[in-house]
C-alpha cells in the first residue's frame, strides 16, 4: 500500500482499510515516500506516524528510503521506536545519492553490529539510476534483504526506464537468483497489454 496514493481524507479512512485487509485475509506492506534520516542525519520526525499508520493497516512492515544516514548515533532511538510500535522496518535503495551502495552498506553494517532488526528492500533497477552495479549490490547486501522490488531497467533518453525482467536481457533474471529466494517480491514495472 503506497501512502503517496492517498489524499488527506483517505488517510483518515486507514482504520476501515485495515479492517478490510484483515477480514479478507490479505497481507499488506506499507510504503511511505519518506527518508528514514533527514539531511542533518537525525531520524525523520514523521516516522512514528508512519509506523502507526502501518499498524492501523495491519501491515507486515513499513518501507522507507534510507535518506541521509551519517552515523549510528540515532539507531538506539530507532530501536526504541520500533520496539514501541512492534512494526518491522525495511529500508529501500532509492534513486537518489542516498540509495547508492556505499551508504546502504554503511547502514546495513551499523544495523548488524547493533543487532537492530531492520532489513532491506532491494530495488533491482534503482542501482542503475545511481550508477551502481545491481550484481555488486546483491553480493554485498543479499543477506540483509527481506523484500525485493522486481524490475529491470533499460536506457531511455538520458536515464533509464523500468521494464519487466523478461523483456530485458538475462542479467535481471540472473540477479533474482542472487537474492534470497524466500523474500517476498513486489512488481515495480509497468504492466501493459497482454501482461494485464
Predicted regions and their residues:
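Active-site beta-loop-alpha junctions enriched in small/polar residues
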Residues: 1-4, 31-37, 65-69, 92-96, ...
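N-terminal pre-domain/capping segments
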Residues: 1-56
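Histidine-acidic metal/acid-base catalytic patches
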Residues: 13, 45-58, 72, 77, ...
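Conserved hydrophobic residues forming the short capping helix/wall of the S-adenosyl-L-methionine
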Residues: 18-21, 82, 111
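Short, surface-exposed alpha-helical recognition segments that flank or form part
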Residues: 38, 42, 95, 163
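Catalytic cores of phosphodiester-bond-cleaving enzymes
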Residues: 71, 79-97
Amino acid at each position: 500500500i503506497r501512502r503517496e496514493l492517498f489524499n488527506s481524507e483517505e488517510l483518515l479512512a486507514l482504520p476501515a482499510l485495515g479492517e478490510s485487509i484483515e477480514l479478507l485475509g490479505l497481507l499488506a506492506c506499507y510504503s511511505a515516500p519518506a527518508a528514514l534520516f533527514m539531511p542533518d542525519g537525525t531520524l525523520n520526525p514523521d516516522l512514528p506516524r508512519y509506523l502507526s499508520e502501518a499498524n492501523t493497516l495491519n501491515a507486515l512492515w513499513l518501507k522507507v528510503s534510507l535518506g541521509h544516514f551519517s552515523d549510528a548515533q540515532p539507531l538506539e532511538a530507532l530501536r526504541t521506536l520500533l520496539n514501541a510500535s512492534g512494526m518491522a522496518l525495511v529500508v529501500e535503495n532509492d534513486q537518489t545519492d542516498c540509495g547508492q551502495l556505499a551508504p546502504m552498506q554503511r547502514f546495513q553494517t551499523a544495523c548488524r553490529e547493533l543487532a537492530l532488526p531492520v532489513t532491506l528492500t532491494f530495488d533491482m533497477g534503482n542501482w542503475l539510476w545511481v550508477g551502481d552495479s545491481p550484481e555488486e549490490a546483491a553480493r554485498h547486501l543479499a543477506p540483509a534483504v527481506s523484500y525485493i522490488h522486481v524490475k529491470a531497467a533499460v536506457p531511455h533518453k538520458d536515464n533509464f526506464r523500468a521494464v519487466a525482467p523478461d523483456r530485458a536481457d538475462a542479467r535481471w533474471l540472473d540477479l533474482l537468483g542472487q537474492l534470497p529466494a524466500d523474500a517476498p517480491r513486489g512488481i515495480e514495472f509497468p504492466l501493459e497489454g497482454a501482461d494485464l
